[in-house]
Amino acid sequence: NLENHNILVVYPHPADSATEASGTVALHAERGDKITSVVATYGERHHMQWLHDEESKPAAEQDPAVARMTLEEYRNFKKREAERIAEVLGVNELVFLGWNDHEIYFNLDKVAEIAEVIRRVKPDIVITHLPIHNGAVYNDHPNTGQIVMKALETVANRVRQFDGVDAYHGVKQVFFSFASGEEVNSNSVFTPGIVPDVWVDISAVIDKKIHAIDQLVSQGYHGETARWVVEARDGRWGMLAGCAYAEPFLRPTAITYDTLPMPPRVVSKEYEPTVLHSGRTTAHNVP
């Protein structure tokens, strides 16, 4: 095992950095791993609960600062939310690409931009969205995953005398996370063919995940909603993984072992009832 990991996380929206693999990110940050978080857009075209709530009020009761907010002002607000999320999780570097929300299409310019980040950061682990479409998928999510995978192929196939840069082969594993509800349908746990092969127990840092989601005021995820999101999603994953709260991942390539894998967590495991570290976790008792 590497003593410390260098992890690159790439998501299309600020909210994804809080609702998807944030517990896993917090765990790795606590163990001293370097975390670079890339947010492709400011998320200005979806989950606009803050603006919708204001617009639903009678004109005389509306806050002009919100009701008349410009696109640039709204983007800046979303940017600050992402910055606070990164601070909560212990992210070392936050990178904004400034792409237009709802307009993430697979093209060579975007691939080149992500490839440049990979060359600079030199990660050994990459976390991004599952790059698979189905009829229910919001396309920014899988499109981002596809762009990241092509960028990884691009940096691995550079030749200095042809391209002016060296190839980078340092990424040891990619982990795909699952966007809420998109890979899950109403008739089964997961869409057929999509099955996680890695579960991370995030029970020890669930308060940090709640606190991160609590920053998403523009989306209405703050307050009690932050806890409800975690209970509904990560509590469900935990039920499947055999712990209080978990995050699921799927790897594009298998890991080969010299012998059957028996990590210390499994070898030393003795039965004990699940006990949360901080009692009833709500957004109101998180510092």
Model regions and ranges:
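Metal-dependent de-N-acetylase/amidase catalytic core
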Residues: 1-10, 100, 104-287
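Active-site rim/loop-helix segments in enzyme catalytic domains that contact anionic ligands
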Residues: 1-121, 154, 233, 262, ...
